[in-house]
Design a protein with these regions (language model features):
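Short beta-strand/turn micro-motifs at beta-sheet edges
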Residues: 1-3, 64-65
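N-terminal helix-turn-helix DNA-binding core of bacterial DNA-binding proteins
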Residues: 2-46
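Amphipathic alpha-helical recognition patches that constitute DNA-binding helices
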Residues: 9, 13, 77, 99
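A cross-family signal for key residues in well-ordered alpha-helices
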Residues: 13-16, 30, 52, 87, ...
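Basic amphipathic alpha-helical segments that dock to polyanions
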Residues: 47-54
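Beta-hairpin "wing" of winged helix-turn-helix
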Residues: 55-72, 77
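Basic, amphipathic "hinge/linker" alpha-helix immediately C-terminal to the N-terminal HTH DNA-binding motif
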Residues: 71-90
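Amphipathic alpha-helical dimerization/coiled-coil segments
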Residues: 84-108
Length: 108
């Protein structure tokens, strides 16, 4: 899969997953891999910078959870600004997909 193409969809996918429920980083990575039958397989190196940017931009909020004596995880959840951004990104994505499909159909 073209990594440049995937980069443009990271925030859309992250926001979409977090609209379901709060998740921690590794859980996002495994969910993406499972739900795409391995087509999308992210490394932490690409996920965490996106999570940090979304958090800085106020789209998501992170909260550490777990026993201080054991493994703690940072769970991310969507904010209201994130819900608004997700709706806008979904609309843009739908328009883009439709436009690309039109071009591809005419090329056949």
């Amino acid at each position: 899969m073209d990594s440049e193409l995937i980069k443009g969809t990271l925030s859309l996918i992250i926001l979409s997953l977090l609209s379901r429920r709060a998740m921690y980083g590794y859980e996002i990575v495994t969910t993406v891999k499972e739900e795409t039958d391995g087509v999308l397989e992210w490394k932490a190196g690409s996920l965490y910078p996106s999570l940090h940017k979304l958090e800085k931009d106020g789209m998501i909020r992170g909260q550490w959870e777990g026993d201080p004596d054991s493994r703690r995880r940072k769970f991310y959840q969507l904010t209201e600004a994130g819900r608004t951004a997700l709706a806008e990104k979904e609309e843009s994505w739908s328009q883009l997909c439709a436009a690309i499909c039109q071009i591809m159909e005419k090329s056949e």
